[in-house]
């Protein structure tokens, strides 16, 4: 985005668990091999659950790319203790510059945090909005339904892209406080006013009763019942990419640099 390569909740490990030999195991490989990554400029971590804060991956990224890492309040001490340097904590609605003209803001989410049975909610969970010349992108992390979607729209009224979770939502009596389901993800896009939404948090690790395939099937069924020509909600295949059209007057970063060189 705007010349920056940003990773959100990166996981290249085989399992998401306190130990490497048991726990949820991935159904499919990462969408890109670690060795094929471009230069990584920034890493965003939404919260400290094992499927979002993968310390082994964060260490590899720190060694290979040395990117700044941003997380919610209280996470820096843990990351530094476990060999992940260069992190910074942000509170909800706190903003920092990532590059000239590009700003990162931590935004609310309805979730919780824990790494053990004894540290629940001792660190902050959040979503992220990155704003730059090409527009604003929202990454929800994990979240249940709540008024924060409307609050985010009020502060960022022209979202171009929303990355919204659709998996780990059943059984609803247990999961609804922390995970939206596919139909709620569609409502979230509508509430946010995002032009495009891309589904995340599905199909890789089994963590709830909805399993590997149901979230996408439910999303497609819900979209078929409520077609909206003004918005599009996509569930990309593993490894598939999406290019957003340029805004009027917007140039690719390489074109902008070339023009500056001619100036």
Enumerate the language-model features and the residues they cover.
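Pre-active-site segment of Zn-dependent metallo-hydrolases
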Residues: 4-48, 56-60, 74, 114-120, ...
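Catalytic core of the metallo-beta-lactamase
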Residues: 1-4, 98-160, 176-184
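Histidine-centered catalytic micro-motifs
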Residues: 43-51, 199-203
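Cap/insert and terminal regions of metallo-dependent hydrolase folds
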Residues: 26-28, 68-70, 74-77, 136, ...
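Metallo-beta-lactamase
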Residues: 1-36, 71-141, 160-167, 218-240, 244-246, ...
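Short Gly/Ser/Thr- and charged-rich N-terminal loops/segments
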Residues: 254, 259
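Active-site metal-binding loops of divalent metal-dependent hydrolases
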Residues: 10-12, 48, 74, 109-111, ...
């Amino acid at each position: 985005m705007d010349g920056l390569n940003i990773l959100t909740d990166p996981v290249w490990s085989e399992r998401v668990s306190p130990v490497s030999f048991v726990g949820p195991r991935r159904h499919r490989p990462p969408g890109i091999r670690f060795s094929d990554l471009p230069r990584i400029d920034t890493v965003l971590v939404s919260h400290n659950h094992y499927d979002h804060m993968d310390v082994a991956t964060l260490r590899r990224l720190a060694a290979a790319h040395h990117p700044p890492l941003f997380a919610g309040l209280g996470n820096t001490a843990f990351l530094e203790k476990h060999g992940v340097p260069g992190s910074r904590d942000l509170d909800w609605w706190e903003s920092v510059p990532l590059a000239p003209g590009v700003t990162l803001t931590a935004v609310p989410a309805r979730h919780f945090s824990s790494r053990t049975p004894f540290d629940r909610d001792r660190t902050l969970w959040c979503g992220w909005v990155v704003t730059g010349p090409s527009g604003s992108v929202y990454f929800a992390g994990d979240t249940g339904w709540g008024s924060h979607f409307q609050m985010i729209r009020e502060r960022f009224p022209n979202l171009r892209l929303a990355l919204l979770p659709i998996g780990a939502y059943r059984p609803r009596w247990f999961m609804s406080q922390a995970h939206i389901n596919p139909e709620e993800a569609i409502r979230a896009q509508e509430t946010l006013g995002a032009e495009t939404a891309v589904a995340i948090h599905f199909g890789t690790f089994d963590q709830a009763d909805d399993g590997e395939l149901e979230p996408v099937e439910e999303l497609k069924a819900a979209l078929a019942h409520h077609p909206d020509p003004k918005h599009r909600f996509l569930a990309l295949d593993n490894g598939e990419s999406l290019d957003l059209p340029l805004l009027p007057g917007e140039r690719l970063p390489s074109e902008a640099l070339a023009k500056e060189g001619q100036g």
